[in-house]
Curated annotation (Swiss-Prot):
<feature type="modified residue" description="N6-(pyridoxal phosphate)lysine">
    <location>
        <position position="253"/>
    </location>
</feature>
<keyword id="KW-0963">Cytoplasm</keyword>
<keyword id="KW-0663">Pyridoxal phosphate</keyword>
<dbReference type="InterPro" id="IPR005958">
    <property type="entry name" value="TyrNic_aminoTrfase"/>
</dbReference>
<dbReference type="InterPro" id="IPR004839">
    <property type="entry name" value="Aminotransferase_I/II_large"/>
</dbReference>
<dbReference type="Pfam" id="PF00155">
    <property type="entry name" value="Aminotran_1_2"/>
</dbReference>
<dbReference type="GO" id="GO:0009058">
    <property type="term" value="P:biosynthetic process"/>
</dbReference>
<dbReference type="GO" id="GO:0006572">
    <property type="term" value="P:tyrosine catabolic process"/>
</dbReference>
<comment type="pathway">
    <text>Amino-acid degradation; L-phenylalanine degradation; acetoacetate and fumarate from L-phenylalanine: step 2/6.</text>
</comment>
<protein>
    <recommendedName>
        <fullName>Tyrosine aminotransferase</fullName>
        <ecNumber>2.6.1.5</ecNumber>
    </recommendedName>
</protein>
<keyword id="KW-0496">Mitochondrion</keyword>
<dbReference type="GO" id="GO:0004838">
    <property type="term" value="F:L-tyrosine-2-oxoglutarate transaminase activity"/>
</dbReference>
<dbReference type="InterPro" id="IPR015424">
    <property type="entry name" value="PyrdxlP-dep_Trfase"/>
</dbReference>
<comment type="subunit">
    <text>Homodimer.</text>
</comment>
<dbReference type="InterPro" id="IPR005957">
    <property type="entry name" value="Tyrosine_aminoTrfase"/>
</dbReference>
<keyword id="KW-0585">Phenylalanine catabolism</keyword>
<keyword id="KW-0032">Aminotransferase</keyword>
Length: 416
């Protein structure tokens, strides 16, 4: 009898998620100290940030109703899609003449933000095409592109300019095979929030280059105001332009339910220049047949009836932790943080010359975990060698302990 030939597909072999691989497979530290995870952007740790009671109540009612146990349309239920359109229109589109462009029929639900990224990229890009991708950037863009044979032109976001995108570099990188421009605002991993002018400059550049725009706005509204009381989030939906735009949003971050796996893609194209983009979203969504139905049933309550004070409190807690970390991590030898302005992350430069036996950001990550049981992420994962990323969602007391451990670690490895 011949042996079985059961081998992994070439496609599966191309799939690699660096954040999950590093965080899920890190070797246990021999340190007796309890682990401090500052690696994965999960806002539910410690129950420091809580889902609203009304949201939980609505989910329970949906389960008990026996009305949500069957199939919904693959694009999502009409009620959930209407809730997304209404919330986005009322929250992030300030020009009255543009509000009519945000409609239910242009919303496609997805099973979380990562699924939305896959849908948006593969809806318009074939193998051999290219996407313009930010660096530092969320690694899942690269995960999807590599899995589907899509090339990437990486453009820089500059730390010296509050992590703004290098627009001249985007212009130079664009070629005949480029099909899509990807932007992230507020940014994972940078913790940045673009000014309205910079968002408009990106939109105008996409217009000039005739490139559809995929805007990852999963952290919409999560902006810090302590240093700038006038700081605000600007969506690419809030501009009159001929650019077809697909905007990613979801419940994972500001509504504190990443495990519910519910996001959305909002197509904005009042001039009708990219209708096949929307059709592509609908088709690739059929591969999963839509997100969880009971969660869809709770979406309207979550978006439209969660008290603004609850959402503001979530952002305020994240900002408090972010600013504590920013104000104290620089006390550690070799670390120079950049100012966090939104999302739930802080990036710090690592001056490797300050250490006698740490040569890369990956070594910094590995040794810090081994010796102090503090888990951060190396900047290399985000195409930012020489940096480290720390999450900012945990209580301040956690960061007090983390800073003390990191400080001791850096002192121990400091060059003489």
């Amino acid at each position: 009898m011949s042996s079985w030939d059961v081998s992994m597909s070439n496609h599966a072999g191309l799939v690699f998620n660096p954040i999950r691989t590093v965080s899920d497979n890190a070797k246990p530290s021999p340190s007796p100290k309890p682990i401090i995870k500052l690696s994965v952007g999960d806002p539910t740790l410690d129950k420091n940030l809580l889902t609203s009671a009304a949201q939980i109540k609505k989910l329970k009612e949906a389960i008990d109703s026996q009305e949500c146990n069957g199939y919904f349309p693959t694009v999502g239920s009409p009620e959930a899609r209407e809730a997304v359109a209404t919330w986005w229109r009322n929250s992030f589109v300030h020009k009255e003449e543009l509000k009519s462009t945000i409609v239910k029929d242009n919303v496609v639900l997805c099973s979380g933000g990562s699924h939305g990224i896959l849908m948006a990229i593969t809806a318009i890009c074939d193998a051999g095409d290219y996407a313009l991708v930010p660096q530092p950037g969320f690694p899942h863009y690269e995960t999807v592109c590599k899995a589907y044979g899509i090339g990437m032109h990486f453009y820089n976001c500059r730390p010296e300019n509050d992590w703004e995108a290098d627009l001249d570099e985007i212009r130079r990188l664009k070629d005949d095979k480029t099909k899509l421009l990807i932007v992230t605002n507020p940014s994972n991993p940078c913790g940045s929030n673009f000014s309205r002018k910079h968002v408009e400059d990106i939109v105008r550049l996409a217009e000039e280059l005739r490139l559809p725009l995929f805007s990852d706005e999963i952290y919409a509204g999560m902006v810090f105001k302590g240093k700038d009381p006038n700081a605000t989030f600007t969506s690419v939906a809030d501009f009159e332009t001929t650019v077809p735009r697909v905007i990613l949003g979801g419940t994972a971050k500001n509504l504190v339910v990443p495990g519910w796996r519910l996001g959305w893609l909002l197509y904005v194209d009042p001039h009708g220049n990219g209708p096949s983009f929307l059709e592509g979203l609908k088709r690739v969504g059929m591969l999963v047949c839509g997100p969880c139905t009971v969660v869809q049933a709770a979406l309207g309550e979550a978006l439209l009836n969660t008290p603004q004070e609850h959402l503001d409190q979530i952002v305020a807690k994240i900002e408090e932790s972010a600013m504590y970390l920013y104000n104290h991590i620089g006390e550690c030898i070799g670390l120079a943080p950049t100012m966090p302005r939104g999302a739930m992350y802080l990036m710090s430069r690592i001056d490797l010359e300050k250490y006698r036996d740490i040569k890369t950001d990956v070594e910094f990550f590995e040794k810090l975990l081994e010796e102090e049981n503090v888990q951060v992420l190396p900047g290399t994962i985000f195409h930012a060698p020489g940096f480290t990323r720390l999450t900012t969602t945990r209580p301040v007391e956690v960061y007090r302990e983390a800073v003390e451990r990191i400080k001791a670690f850096c002192q121990r490895h400091a060059a003489v």
